Amino acid sequence: MREETKKFIEDRQPHAAKPLKVVSVKLVGGKRPNDCSNNALDVVDEMDRVRPITGWLVNPLNPLTGEVEILAHWWNADAKGNHFDTTPCLYNEAEYVEDLDLYTFAHKNYDAIESIVASSLKYKNGVYIACESNLKEIRTITERSISSLANKELFKL
């Protein structure tokens, strides 16, 4: 586990009831880009004994910007605990961190949140910034300050 991932887990864990953990994920692809939650939920409908998994893709520190990109993400696991991701992804150096509290929060607050996918994050100089992209304009990213890594901050509740 890289230092960036370890730091993120330490910072997020106090806000999550379930333990966060790094998991090994097989990159399968084949589904729609930039649609991870729908891809994961579609797989649940298409396959037996498969469940959606929520969490994060923690990328390595970018030496040019001094930033760490932490992307909120959905993937799947089978009944044996094998994790796999059907969303095409360019982040082959990212570490997958399972955070099932994101799913629980999104499910309980479905009608009050804009998206069932949490805000992605940028970490620099000890500060986390929430980042949202407009899926109609992929290159448009809005940043907002957050006071903690609590679910209500990550989902704009």
Where are these regions (language model features)?
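A structural boundary/capping signal
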Residues: M1-L157
